[in-house]
Amino acid sequence: MKNDFYQEDELLNSCLTNRGFLLSKIDEVISWARANSLWPMTFGLACCAVEMMQAAASRYDMDRFGMLFRPSPRQSDLMIVAGTLTNKMAPALRKVYDQMTEPKWVLSMGSCANGGGYYHFSYSVVRGCDRIVPVDVYVPGCPPTAEALIYGLMQLQKKIKRTTGFKYDSR
């Protein structure tokens, strides 16, 4: 009985695809669309922001991945934290994160954003932005190259494609 169901399903798939129809699951389509249309919001705090600008320029062209930088957190679904996060800036980071639309992702770029970096033992530095907001992808380096940032974004796209449909972690 189970094999009959799969044989009928394969027969239906082959008949419809030969006629120009595309069969897919809605969960796969939604996760594909989310992964290929990320709208990052920059939160550039130090020199890593320069590398982020370079990655968005014409040589690397992040637009080809469907990424469009947005100035407002209400229009973006990805926050790229680039640079040293101080104790004074931490509440602003959390406020901006809370204003982002669901589902939302965070990419931590550079040693300072990942763990405090060179200023790790300073009294005024947060030792990693993951203490303030949940981070999905870490990009190491001081500062990380534009290629490293693009690789991190591609890893985030893979992570998003593994999620299913309407389910997301509201954190």
Curated annotation (Swiss-Prot):
Cofactor: binding details: Binds 1 [4Fe-4S] cluster.
Intracellular or extracellular location(s): Cell inner membrane
GO biological process, one term: electron transport coupled proton transport
A GO cellular component annotation in the UniProt record: plasma membrane
Primary site of residence: membrane
EC number: 7.1.1.-
Gene3D superfamilies: 3.40.50.12280
Keywords: 4Fe-4S, Cell inner membrane, Cell membrane, Iron, Iron-sulfur, Membrane, Metal-binding, NAD, Quinone, Translocase, Transport, Ubiquinone
GO terms of molecular function: 4 iron, 4 sulfur cluster binding; iron ion binding; NADH dehydrogenase (ubiquinone) activity; NADH:ubiquinone reductase (non-electrogenic) activity; quinone binding
Alphabetical list of Pfam families matching this protein: Oxidored_q6
Catalysis: reaction(s): a quinone + NADH + 5 H(+)(in) = a quinol + NAD(+) + 4 H(+)(out)
Primary role: NDH-1 shuttles electrons from NADH, via FMN and iron-sulfur (Fe-S) centers, to quinones in the respiratory chain. Couples the redox reaction to proton translocation (for every two electrons transferred, four hydrogen ions are translocated across the cytoplasmic membrane), and thus conserves the redox energy in a proton gradient.
Descriptive protein name: NADH-quinone oxidoreductase subunit B
Organism annotation: Rickettsia typhi (strain ATCC VR-144 / Wilmington)
Name of the gene encoding the protein in the UniProt record: nuoB
